[in-house]
Structures are given as C-alpha cells and as structure tokens.
Curated annotation (Swiss-Prot):
Residue ranges occupied by any YcgL domain in the UniProt entry: 8-92
Identification of the protein by name: YcgL domain-containing protein HD_1373
Source organism: Haemophilus ducreyi (strain 35000HP / ATCC 700724)
A Pfam family of this chain: YcgL
TM region(s), chain numbering: none
Taxonomic path: Bacteria, Pseudomonadati, Pseudomonadota, Gammaproteobacteria, Pasteurellales
Length: 99
C-alpha cells in the first residue's frame, strides 16, 4: 500500500494504555491505514503534536527518514520505547557485588 502524504508533517499520538508507545500517522485523526487490531492494542490515542519529518529537528528515539518511509509505505509508524531502567535493581546488584 502506498500512502500519499500532503507534506512531510506527521501527527504523533501516545498510547494511554501502553507506556512509551507512540503512533505516527500522515494526517491528524486519520487512522484508516492503521490495522484495527493494532488500534485496539494501542488503546485510545492521545494527540501529542504535529512534527515536520523533513525539518532540522530530529526525533529523540527514531530516525526521521525511517518514520517518513514507514508512513509512505505502510501508512503508519509504531514506536515502542525501551523499558525504563530499574535503578533499584541495579543498585542492589552493585551493592551485592561490593561485599
């Protein structure tokens, strides 16, 4: 499937049910290219912002061009952030090693 983007802007949504999960689509509130099963898993999307993928500002965790290509070819890009570090667990491991 090929998605026609009107510009290099995309709409970014965060999942309210899955921490660190973001969905990038070509146009705000146009989820028709996103599989229904993915939308159900994602939960109610909360709009974050419009973002210029061709601009000078890079995304923090993913490459702008990778997102743009995914949107153009499959209609969306799903970002799943790595889990947060468990600092307590790391501390306890280090504390145990020092004994």
């Amino acid at each position: 499937m090929y998605i026609v983007m009107n510009s290099n802007f995309c709409a970014i949504y965060k999942s309210m049910s899955k921490e660190g999960m973001f969905l990038y689509i070509a146009q705000r509130d146009k989820f028709n290219a996103v599989p229904e099963q993915l939308l159900q898993m994602f939960g109610k999307p909360q709009f974050v912002m419009l973002f210029n993928l061709a601009g000078e500002k890079p995304l923090k965790q993913v490459n702008n061009q990778d997102v743009l290509l995914a949107i153009k070819t499959q209609g969306f890009f799903l970002q799943i952030s790595p889990p947060a570090e468990n600092l307590l667990k790391q501390f306890l491991i280090q504390k145990g090693e020092k004994k």
